[in-house]
Regions:
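N-terminal membrane-targeting hydrophobic helices
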Residues: 1-258
Length: 258
């Protein structure tokens, strides 16, 4: 699939699950944007993609390294193993709430080196989403950095959302959902994905061959893209009609005191 449609699919998945995740409106906006960026994250294994060109030679060099380690495009990063690596990395990047300092009485994080991994990752995701959607032009990188800093200030990336009996940083959830949406999208195409890499290189598909489509051809342009736009619009409309309540994590209860 094209980067634009990968970004839309990531945004759609987070918006569709927003009421289940119990996020408020501010966190919904951040989550949708982060998940849109994560929707193109697996393509960091290819140099000619929106995410690989987000920050010039820095991301291009990193892309070459990822491609070398993962076996090339649509291999390691397009597998269950790849989703796990991205998710674990983003979990630790977003988990600085556990030890990062707070501004007394405000609840926003004070400046700390704990912020750096999350700021870097969110800058990459925001910038990649903007590039994939052809928004922001040459200023997409600066907008991505600004968005990451704003997200940190509002504490959106600090939010721990309930997943079963766990409370997981929203950044990790957005990355996991976005990567999963990306792989599912590629499994609709003729190329498929080796989801059990490195144990197996067999390419899996979600549709029978007659229903599979080719990237950037008529089916994706005139059917898949409009469906994603309509689906995202309906999901956001649905979220707007339902109160989105952000639950407090056990740590937040303890910090608030009696």
């Amino acid at each position: 699939m094209m980067g634009r449609d990968h970004a839309l699919s990531g945004a759609l998945v987070f918006a569709a699950l927003a009421t289940t995740l119990h996020v408020n409106d501010a966190h919904l906006a951040a989550g949708v944007a982060l998940c849109a960026g994560a929707g193109v994250l697996p393509d960091i294994d290819h140099q000619d993609t929106s995410i690989s060109s987000s920050f010039g030679f820095l991301t291009e060099g990193f892309s070459r390294l990822v491609a070398l380690l993962s076996g090339g495009h649509r291999h390691g990063t397009h597998s269950i193993f790849g989703i796990a690596v991205f998710t674990v990395g983003s979990y630790f990047a977003g988990a600085y709430q556990l030890s990062g300092p707070k501004v007394t009485g405000i609840g926003h994080p004070a400046f700390s080196w704990h912020l750096v991994p999350a700021v870097l990752l969110m800058s990459l995701l925001y910038s990649a989403a903007l590039r994939a959607l052809h928004v922001g032009g040459h200023h997409g990188d600066l907008l991505g950095i600004g968005g990451a800093l704003l997200t940190c200030y509002t504490g959106a990336d600090l939010t721990r959302l309930p997943v079963g009996s766990w409370h997981v940083p929203m950044l990790a959830i957005a990355v996991a959902l976005g990567c999963a949406a990306h792989i599912a999208g590629d499994e609709l195409t003729h190329g498929g994905c080796p989801i059990f890499w490195p144990a197996s290189m067999h390419e899996f598909h979600l549709l029978p061959r007659p229903l599979q489509f080719t990237t950037a051809k008529l089916c994706e342009t005139w059917i898949v893209f409009p469906l994603l736009v309509v689906g995202l619009g309906l999901a956001v409309w649905h979220d707007a009609g339902h109160p989105l309540v952000l639950p407090s994590s056990p740590g937040q209860h303890a910090a608030s005191g009696p």
